[in-house]
Amino acid sequence: TPPNLPRKIPDGVDVPDVHTPESGLGGVVAKSAGAERSPVMALVGNWRNLTWLKTIGPVLSAGRSVLVVAASAAEVSQIADRAAATWGELVVRIAGEDDKTDTRAWQSAQSPPRLVIGTPKTASWLIGGLGLAIVLEEGRRAMKDRQTPTLHVRDLMRTRSRLEGFNLVFFGPTPSVELLAAGAETVREGNRAWPLVEVVDRTEDQPGSGFLSERSLAAISATAKGGERVFVFTHRRIGFASMRCTRCRTLRSCSRCGTRVGRVDSCPRCGTAIGACRNCGHTEFEEMGTIPDRLVSEIDRRMGPGAAVVHPADGLVIVGTERDLAGLPMVALAVAADVDGMLLGTGYRTTEEALRQLARLALAVKEGRGTRLILQTSRPDSLLVTTMRRGDPIPYLERVLVERAREAAPPASEMIAVEIRGAVPEAVATDLASLEGAVAMGPIDVLDGKRWLLTGSLGKARIGLRPLVGRWRDWGATVRVDADPIDV
C-alpha cells in the first residue's frame, strides 16, 4: 500500500444523477447506502454485461465508496472504461501500470465517494469511506497469491468486511464451493448464469472426422462470413485431450478405477496400465481435442488459409486457451472443442474447475440473436453438460461439496502443501509427521524439488510449521507453503 499522504488527498467529486435499474444487487446497495450491515452475498449471474454498474448509484450518492476487484488488468480496463461513461471522475482505475500511477490512484481512493476498480492487489488497500465491495469471479486462479503466505482475495475480503463494517458481494457465474460452504447468501441475477448453450454429440461423428464436428465447422464458417467474431477454446497441452475408441466411440478409461484418460500409458490415479477399450476390446483410439495450432489448421482447411489465428493475433476466428479469456473481446460464437478432456486428471478441484472454465467461456458470448456457446462432447447427458445447458451452477456445486466431504478434501478439511526446492534437509519428513493434528503425505517429485501435503484440522500444525520453515530456510532450502492449494 502506498504511504499515507494526507496533504495530497484530493477533494471529493460530485455524483451524477443516474437512474438505478433493478438488480440482484438492489438490497445490498440500499443497505450499504444507509450504512446497514448485510450478509455476505454470492450473486450468481453474468457480470460481463456490466449493466450492474448503474445500480451502485445510491451508495455513491450517500457519500460512500465502492470497490470492485477483477482478476486481470485487461478486465479492470474494460470495466473502468464502461463505468467512466456513467460515473465520470468518480472512477479510480488500478490496473498496475506503474508505481506512480498506483500511488496517484491510491490518493484519489481516500476521498469518498469513489468507484475504485482494481486488480486483486487492491483487496488489501485502504479505501476511504468504503461502503460496498464487489469481487468478480473469486474462484479464479489470479485471486490467490502464488507467493507465501498465498493469501486468497475471498478470505481477505471476508475478514476485512467483518472488521471494517462494509458490505461484501461475490459476483460471478460459479461461486466457489469454499464460498458456499462459508454460508454466503446465494442470490440469482436473471434466469440463467450464462448465455445459451448448444450441445454437439460427438458420438454421432464417424471415426477420423477431425477435432471439430461438421456442425461446429458450419457454425464457425457462417458466423465468420457474417462478420462476427468466433473463439475456439482448447487445452494447453495435448496430453489433456480425451480419446475415444475408433470402433465403438466409447471414451478411453482405466479398466480398474474407471478414470477417463488421454494419451497416457498408465492411469494417473491408480497406476494401472491402460490397454484396450473397456467396452469392445478394440486397441485403436483417436484424440478428440488438441493444441491450438492443429485446430487452426483444421479450420483453415474448411475456410481457406489464414481464416483462423492463435490468440493474441487478431482475426474473426481466434483459437486459444483459458489464459486468453481475460483480454478476449466479446464474441458471437464460442466453441469448446473437447469438454470431456476438461474432466481428465485426478485433482480434487477438477470437476469444479471444468464448470468454472466453461462458464467463463460462456460469458465471452455477447447477447443477441443466434449467439451461443457450442459444447463438443461424447457424453451429452453428463452432469457437467446438463448443468451448462440449464444455466444454473448451484446443484452441481452442491454435489461437489458432498463429494469433497466424502473425500475429506477442502473445504471439508484443511490442506497445506509444503514445497522445498533444491537440496532437501534430511529431517523434513520426520518434522512434518510430528505436527499435532496433521496427516503428512508424500513426498512427490515437483520441478526441482519435493512436495508434501498436510491434511486434517491444522490449527496447531500451522503454529508448529512456522519454526520448521524458518529452520529449513536458515539451512539454505527454498520453501513455499500453500494453504488449500489449487493444483493437487
Regions picked out by a protein language model, each given a short descriptive name:
Residues 175, 211-228, 298, 302-488:
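C-terminal helicase module of SF1/SF2 nucleic-acid helicases/translocases
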Residues 134, 169-170, 231-233, 244, ...:
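Structured core elements
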Residues 196-201, 268, 278, 335-336, ...:
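Active-site-flanking beta-strand signature of metal-NTP-handling nucleotidyl enzymes
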Residues 150-154, 292, 296, 351-355:
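Amphipathic alpha-helical segments in well-structured domains
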Residues 170, 206-210, 285-289, 348-351, ...:
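Hydrophobic alpha-helical scaffolding
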Residues 1-198, 202-205, 214, 221-236, ...:
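Accessory, non-ATPase domains that flank or precede helicase/AAA+ motor cores in DNA-metabolism machines
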Residues 138-139, 143, 278-285, 338-346, ...:
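Short hinge/gating elements
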Residues 216, 222-302:
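Cys/His-rich short segments
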